[in-house]
């Protein structure tokens, strides 16, 4: 199990090291959300993550019938997205331990920050890659 937490330590979680996908997202929403050039995200089944501390501090943002964010209600750190298909998107920056699956590609590089240069050899997609 990998450990993760919010910025203020009010919420902690454990997640199985069984991510099915991982990527670096350069879309304008992820850049605004993080204040960084991109956001590294791992996707995993909802049943693979367990909140181990601070469940009472969780805050849901968005439509529970669609995709929504789960944040710490104290520091507002984004802990994961929940999708209707049963998967979660976990920001790798909230993990304490390193996951086995590293990001496999960059997406939305068509709208990436102009000041940032991608220096690795991972595949780059202008938008969300299909299939």
Kindly give the residue locations of the regions a language model identified:
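A short Gly-Trp-Pro
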Residues: 1-131
